[in-house]
């Protein structure tokens, strides 16, 4: 998806390439043929052993499987890029800006990736964005430095701090 790739590139500062590949287990055979071939086995097992439910998505980083080769920060960047691509898709389909919730974005991301993410959001997203953080002044400081209008609220023991 070009939108996903573009977002990931911005978060990673064009340092890494990513991909998503659909992997079918049908191996060129028709679904009907595979279901017929496996019918006795499936009845015995009481489950369907072939079909699109066995297909998968392979996520890659620099053409290597993301699960095996990516750091936690790269995995979180990948996940954020997918979420932001979904946001863009919904915005384009519905014609409205969905509310975006980013929970603890500093967890697993280095400050450069967070800065790139915030810059991307400022440039490309309109609407309400809720960002949570475990450090009280980190996000407000970053947003203030960028001249971004924001409302900062602190919750202590489950209650808004006044």
What does each model-identified segment do?
Residues 133-135:
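Conserved H-loop
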Residues 103-105:
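Walker B catalytic acidic pair
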């Amino acid at each position: 998806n070009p939108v996903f790739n573009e977002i990931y590139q911005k978060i990673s500062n064009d340092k890494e390439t990513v991909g998503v590949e659909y992997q079918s287990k049908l191996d060129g055979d028709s679904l009907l043929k595979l279901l017929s071939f496996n019918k006795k086995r499936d009845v015995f097992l009481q489950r369907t052993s072939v079909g699109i439910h066995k297909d998968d998505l392979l996520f890659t980083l620099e053409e290597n499987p993301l699960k095996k080769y990516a750091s936690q920060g790269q995995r979180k960047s990948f996940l954020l890029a997918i979420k932001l691509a979904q946001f863009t898709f919904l915005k384009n389909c519905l014609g409205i800006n969905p509310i975006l919730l980013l929970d603890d974005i500093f967890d697993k991301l280095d400050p450069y990736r967070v800065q790139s993410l915030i810059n991307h959001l400022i440039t490309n997203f309109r609407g309400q964005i809720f960002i949570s953080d475990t450090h009280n002044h980190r996000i407000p400081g970053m947003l203030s430095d960028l001249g971004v209008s924001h409302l900062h609220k602190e919750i202590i023991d489950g209650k808004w701090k006044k």
